[in-house]
């Protein structure tokens, strides 16, 4: 299967929101809000348009990845800019076929070419360690409360960039979504039934798990 990667265009916006909704529906909780995140991220000051990519198969958009600016702060109060990606969305019928891998690898190469040094994300280690991500604790990166979430992962694009300090990750506030606005936005799409999937319990456990 040939996968084409290119920058997202304005006329792709709704298609990307639709595929994101399909990709995440009922995965983390009944329904989803990732399509609303995509919608608001594009107009947020932390958005990095140069790292906004879509994946196409036979001319059809089947995947998307987006990045936002974030920070890490050390024990001296010094801040360094890092970047974070999410959501990474792939239409269910195209998952496990290399689409997500192509988006992640392509965008990481571009991030390196742009001079970015570190990427910090939240995600399941099983999905991201194969790209070089490690538990954030391995790089002395905690959350803002000084704890090490199981799902917080990082990669140094420039090796050694974070040496000799303890860091706290400060994500973009764009990820703090207004649930009422998200529900309102979802009503602009065709109605979908919600339900339970085991992945919702897995997500709940992961969100409450920490590395000591």
Give, region by region, the residue ranges found by the protein language model.
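Acidic/histidine-enriched, glycine/proline-rich intrinsically disordered or flexible terminal extensions
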Residues: 161-212
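Conserved acetyl-CoA-binding loop-helix of GNAT-fold acetyltransferases
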Residues: 85, 90, 96-109, 120-121
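Conserved active-site alpha-helix within GNAT-family acetyltransferase domains
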Residues: 113-117, 122-147
């Amino acid at each position: 299967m040939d996968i084409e990667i290119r920058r997202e265009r304005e006329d792709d916006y709704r298609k990307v929101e639709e595929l994101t909704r399909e990709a995440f529906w009922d995965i983390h909780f009944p329904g989803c809000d990732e399509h609303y995140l995509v919608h608001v991220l594009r107009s947020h000051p932390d958005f990095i348009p140069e790292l906004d990519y879509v994946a196409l198969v036979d001319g059809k958009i089947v995947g998307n990845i987006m990045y936002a600016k974030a920070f890490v702060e050390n024990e001296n109060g010094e801040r360094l800019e890092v970047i974070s990606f999410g959501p990474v969305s792939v239409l269910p019928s195209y998952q496990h076929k290399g689409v997500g891998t192509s988006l992640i690898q392509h965008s990481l190469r571009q991030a390196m070419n742009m001079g970015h040094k570190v990427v910090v994300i939240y995600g399941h280690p099983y999905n991201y360690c194969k790209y070089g991500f490690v538990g954030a604790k391995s790089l002395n990166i905690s959350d803002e409360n000084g704890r090490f979430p199981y799902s917080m992962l990082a990669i140094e694009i420039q090796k050694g960039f974070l040496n000799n300090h303890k860091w706290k990750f400060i994500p973009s506030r764009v990820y703090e979504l207004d649930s009422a606005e998200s529900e309102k936005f979802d009503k602009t799409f065709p109605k979908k039934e919600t339900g339970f999937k085991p992945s919702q319990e897995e997500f709940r456990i992961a969100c409450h798990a920490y590395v000591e």
